[in-house]
């Protein structure tokens, strides 16, 4: 195993293939999208475990370590090839991440699978954060709602970014990943193959022209869409914008993905301790289908 600050194109390709193999075997992606985006950059550390099979080296394990950022601790995500498991590779990589990032480092277990729970217990790690994946069919949606003195539009280009950033960073000031965005965060996502301005909805105050909230949708496949981000300016809370924007995006995804008798679902992620949001999404017909858990050697109250 070795730490690397940047990856060659070939190494990044091998890691993507590793992630695909693990996803197929486990039924859940072992790392988040932000890790895949980070493969082309040097903003995180890359721990790579390779095996020489005589025909060349193959990546058998990979860990991404994102450094601490303001109040957010270091974040680690790890994946081991299905054919290379039960050899201690994952445990060794996690130990290396804890040594590199410190005891407050969070190690994500996507899906919190049995093997991940056993590894966490063996390493003496404690669950410190839970992220719920909720899902519902894109059928029989609740009717769309409106909000008074609000104009809805779709994203029209980078000149909208300043207002999107203002609302996003106000709405998610508490969030370790979603808060503190810059122009680069939007530009990077705008360059992703899935980006579609027609699925990026904005709500403006009719009187002042200020952005009040937004709903960014994402299409993963012909059968799965996502409520990617819903953000409402805290100063505009209480006007029904969250529900109106969410339903606007859901109906857009239904129209895009369920034509010609096709069947599709929509999913989202929400913090488990955000009970108000969880209740809201349950009222909209979402159910919990998966849980991602962050483990750490030190509980938050001890940091």
Curated annotation (Swiss-Prot):
Acetyl-CoA 2 binds at residues 230-232, 274-279. Its EC number is 2.3.1.189. The keyword Lyase does not apply. It catalyses: 1D-myo-inositol 2-(L-cysteinylamino)-2-deoxy-alpha-D-glucopyranoside + acetyl-CoA = mycothiol + CoA + H(+). 1D-myo-inositol 2-(L-cysteinylamino)-2-deoxy-alpha-D-glucopyranoside binds at residues 33, 177, 218, 226, 269. Keywords: Acyltransferase, Repeat, Transferase. InterPro entries: Acyl_CoA_acyltransferase, GNAT_dom, MshD_Acetyltransferase, Mycothiol_AcTrfase. GO terms for molecular function: mycothiol synthase activity; protein-N-terminal-alanine acetyltransferase activity. It is an enzyme of class 2 (transferase). Residues 150-303 form the N-acetyltransferase domain. Transmembrane segments: none annotated. GO terms for biological process: mycothiol biosynthetic process. Acetyl-CoA 1 binds at residues 78-80, 86-91. The keyword Transferase applies. PANTHER family: L-AMINO ACID N-ACETYLTRANSFERASE, MYCOTHIOL ACETYLTRANSFERASE. Monomer. Belongs to the acetyltransferase family. MshD subfamily. Catalyzes the transfer of acetyl from acetyl-CoA to desacetylmycothiol (Cys-GlcN-Ins) to form mycothiol. HAMAP family: MshD. This is Mycothiol acetyltransferase. It comes from Mycolicibacterium gilvum (strain PYR-GCK). The gene is mshD.
């Amino acid at each position: 195993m070795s730490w690397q600050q940047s990856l060659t194109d070939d190494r990044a390709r091998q890691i993507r293939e590793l992630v695909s193999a693990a996803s197929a075997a486990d039924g859940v992606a072992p790392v988040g999208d932000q890790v895949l985006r980070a493969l082309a950059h040097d903003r995180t550390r890359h721990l790579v475990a390779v095996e020489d099979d005589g025909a060349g080296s193959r990546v058998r394990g990979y860990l991404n370590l994102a450094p601490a950022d303001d109040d957010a601790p270091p974040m680690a995500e790890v994946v081991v090839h299905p054919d290379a498991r039960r050899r201690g590779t994952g445990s060794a990589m996690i130990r290396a991440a804890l040594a590199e990032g410190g005891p407050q480092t969070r190690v994500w277990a996507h899906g919190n699978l049995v093997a991940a729970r056993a590894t966490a217990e063996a390493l003496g790690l404690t669950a410190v954060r839970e992220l719920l994946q909720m899902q519902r069919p894109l059928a029989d949606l609740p009717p769309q709602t409106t909000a008074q003195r609000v104009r809805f539009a779709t994203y029209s280009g980078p000149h909208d970014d300043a207002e999107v950033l203002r609302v996003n960073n106000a709405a998610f000031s508490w969030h370790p990943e979603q808060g503190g965005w810059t122009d680069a965060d939007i530009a990077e996502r705008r360059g992703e193959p899935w980006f579609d301005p027609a699925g990026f909805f904005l709500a403006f105050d009719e009187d002042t022209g200020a952005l009040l909230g937004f709903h960014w949708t994402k299409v993963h496949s012909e059968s799965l869409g996502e409520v990617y981000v819903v953000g409402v300016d805290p100063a505009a809370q209480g006007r029904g914008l969250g529900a109106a924007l969410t339903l606007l995006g859901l109906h857009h995804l239904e129209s895009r993905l369920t034509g010609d008798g096709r069947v599709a679902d929509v999913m989202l992620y929400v913090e488990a301790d955000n009970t108000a949001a969880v209740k809201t999404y349950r009222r909209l017909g979402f159910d919990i289908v998966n849980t991602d858990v962050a483990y750490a050697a030190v509980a938050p109250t001890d940091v």
